[in-house]
Each structure stands twice: as structure tokens, then as C-alpha cells.
Amino acid sequence: MNLWDKKAKTYARYQNTLNTIQKQTFEYLQNLNISFQNKSIIDIGCGTGVWTLHLAKEAKEILALDSANAMLEILQEDAKKLNLNNIKCENLSFETWMQNNPNTKFDLAFLSMSPALQNEKDYTNFLNLAKIKIYLGWADYRKSDFLDPIFKYFNTEFKGFYKKDLENYLLEKNIFFHKIVFDETRKVQRTKEEAI
């Protein structure tokens, strides 16, 4: 069982009401005239379907790709409750899926808060999947009342997941992109047992 399978039990699930980031994202995409209506979409690192299920309400078809089977089981359970039957789930890493499907194309490639893109090959594959690409990632700093004192004590900082990230790759390759930074605050409290 991989780490993400373990996280599935407590991972955020689909909510019919859009959260703050989803509202801001869909408004921003609408201002860019990006539509999901009748599109073929791949959602890379889809997790439990927090975004997938909203996209599926408009999409012609959507491929939900994730390396954690437990996440996909939750997505399928919620899709069934919503009577959405245009979602196909595949339990593979992005790298393996690309090796198996090197020539597959979609109208839109979507990736949200997923560590699926690890290197330049992944970035290139993502960019070649579709005409429209949407990538939502962590900007950088994440505050933690638990971790911040530890970082301070050891005179270090949170390194982030993407110090060499897609944005730098796009800049290096002189590829045009739109960028917006959303500000979100989440408060998560865990028991001592959950934190360990």
C-alpha cells in the first residue's frame, strides 16, 4: 500500500458546494473562456475526485488517473451517488500511464495539487497531452504550527515540493502561460496519534 492509499481514509472528499479555491479557479478559467463542456479530459493525480466530479458534470468523458487505488475507490463511490457515468478510472502513476499511452490526446489536461509531475520528461508529456492544460500547484510556503518551531530550532525551512517546478520549466522553454496566485487558509487539527 502506498502513502496515498493510506491518506485516502482522511483525504478531502467531493462536496457539491465549491470551496473557496474551486470558486476562484472556475471564475478565473471562465474569464479565460475555458469551457469543460463536452470535452475529453484527463485529471492527473485525481485523488478522491474533489475536482474530477465537478469537471465530469460538464465533460463528455474524463479519465481519472491516480496511483492510489483507495483514492479511486472513493471517487467511484461518489460518482455512483451522483449518477455520473462518464468517468473512467485508471490506477497508475502518470509516468507508467504515459509509457502505456504515448500517443493519447485529450481536449484538456488537468492536474491539481498532485506530485505526479516529477521531472522535465513529465512536464513535456503533460504539455503534449492536450491543447488546454490546467495545473494547480502549491505556490510555496505552507504554515504549520507544529512544524514551524521544529524548522526554526534546526535553522531550516520547509523546502516545498516543487523548487524545480513546472513554472520554471515553462520560463526556461519560453512557453507562454497564465498564472494567478490564490490565497487559502486551512486549519487542520490532529491528535498526537494522527500526527505520529
Predicted feature residues:
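Substrate-binding/catalytic lobe of Class I Rossmann-like enzymes that use SAM or dcSAM, i.e.
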Residues: 160-196
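Class I SAM-dependent methyltransferase SAM/SAH-binding core
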Residues: 50-85, 90-96
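Conserved Class I S-adenosyl-L-methionine
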Residues: 149-164
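Short conserved loop adjoining the S-adenosyl-L-methionine
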Residues: 96-103
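Conserved beta-strand signature within the Rossmann-like core of class I S-adenosyl-L-methionine
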Residues: 131-142
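Conserved class I S-adenosyl-L-methionine
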Residues: 1-35, 38-47
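A short, conserved alpha-helix within the catalytic core of class I
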Residues: 116-129
